Amino acid sequence: MLQITPIPALSDNYIWILQKECQAIIVDPAEAQAVFAFLAKHQLNPTAILLTHNHHDHTDGVAGLVAQFPDMLIYGSEEVSQFANQIVYPEQQFELLGLKVRVIESAGHTAQHISYLVDNEYLFCGDALFSGGCGRVFTGDYQAQFDALQRFKALPDFVKVYAGHEYTQSNLKFAEAVMATSCSLMEHQERADILRSQHKPTLPSTIGVEKQINPFMQAVTLDEFIILRQKKDNF
């Protein structure tokens, strides 16, 4: 049975651990020590790392983990080639721990950002999509980020969204400022506030929920998306 657990890291990162029996897959290790502690506590053997993009708060733990577990497979796009020993490309599919993994192009935040859709049910999207928001455009461009959101919108509503940061509360404040008031948005703001007051993650979300509460997922045109993204950058 698959278990998915977030390890809080740095100020607001999540390192996601996919656990199946005694084996584990690590997504975007921001640091190594927290992962070591989790693996030891649960007596897990890490078999692979999935990297979404080349920002230090998603890769800084790789070197330490590889030093301890040198046989791990490390997947990523060409922009993380200094870490990855398995370079993957959009729409490539592979299997880990009996799980089918599909690579989804999600550039924009960075030029070669990718996401991983596991068993057509679990989306590990790094900084391409957050609950209520999306990543800033750095080394990618607005068109690429907009296109990535269209790919996410095309996924089934039941797909769970495992983003790389706990940004939900601030994102929903922005959503409240730019979207028409809705019961769904208010309910999710209340839910996020309660969870964070209990020091619990607001993630995962789902694609269906994000279509309702995420202004960037509701942008119909590129121009509309750019206006929203620039407003959020200065919010």
Swiss-Prot record:
Q: Which CDD domains match?
A: hydroxyacylglutathione_hydrolase_MBL-fold
Q: InterPro entries attached here?
A: Clx_II_MBL (IPR035680), Glyoxalase_II_hydrolase (IPR050110), HAGH_C (IPR032282), Hydroxyacylglutathione_Hdrlase (IPR017782), Metallo-B-lactamas (IPR001279), RibonucZ/Hydroxyglut_hydro (IPR036866)
One molecular function GO term is: metal ion binding
E.C. number, please?
Answer: 3.1.2.6
Q: Which reaction does it catalyse?
A: an S-(2-hydroxyacyl)glutathione + H2O = a 2-hydroxy carboxylate + glutathione + H(+)
Name its pathway: Secondary metabolite metabolism; methylglyoxal degradation; (R)-lactate from methylglyoxal: step 2/2
Co-factor: note: Binds 2 Zn(2+) ions per subunit.
- Could you say which cofactors this protein requires? Zn(2+)
Q: Which GO terms describe its biological process?
A: methylglyoxal catabolic process to D-lactate via S-lactoyl-glutathione
Q: Where does Zn(2+) 1 bind?
A: 53, 55, 109, 127
Q: Which UniProt keywords apply?
A: Hydrolase, Metal-binding, Zinc
Query: So where does Zn(2+) 2 get bound?
Result: 57-58, 127, 165
The reply on keyword Metal-binding is: yes
Give the record's family classification: Belongs to the metallo-beta-lactamase superfamily. Glyoxalase II family.
* Oligomer status and interactors: Monomer.
Q: Which NCBIfam families match?
A: GSH_gloB
Q: What does this protein do?
A: Thiolesterase that catalyzes the hydrolysis of S-D-lactoyl-glutathione to form glutathione and D-lactic acid.
Q: What is this protein called?
A: Hydroxyacylglutathione hydrolase
Q: Which gene encodes it?
A: gloB
